[in-house]
Amino acid sequence: DKEYRWSIFGQQLLIGPKYLPGIFKSEKLSSSRSYLAKQLAGEKLPTNTDQWDGYPVEREKFYETISKSQSNVILAGDSHNSWFSNLYDKNNNFIGVEVGAPAISSPSFGDTFGEQTQTVEQAFVEENDDLIWVNGRYKGYVSLDITEEHIDVSFKYVSTVKSKDYTALKPSFFRVEHNKPFSS
């Protein structure tokens, strides 16, 4: 009998697999062409091999270890975008959820891709089966309201960080149920 309901892990890196979507090969994202022409050859390419995507065996070992826990929630940062994912091991066993915190002031997708940011976000969701949602347009933070039965995850943003005059934007909200993958 376990005395706890949630296992919450904090780390700076995203742990769920993130592959670059095929959209990066298109002319729509011409600002990235030179880098992407060198990197993409039609295969699934991890977004960042200097993070967990570069260490898939070690990620599986970590998943195996935490699979013995209840309701795993991985809190991550340092990607400068907001991410929300279900996590599954290589045998498609549900491991937990990942909450990737946004940047407060660092550059993100929105700073790189401008008007094409929503297209990039959607392409990431389509390319990555376990990725529920990504937002690279806004700066802010994430908060968790933890109860015995669920965790409410709220991504909170402001309209700009470049001025003292800003508007608080409507939060993006997810409810994580105990020991269940997120489903909308």
Annotated model-derived regions:
Residues 1-184:
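Long, structured stretches of catalytic cores involved in phosphate-ester chemistry, encompassing
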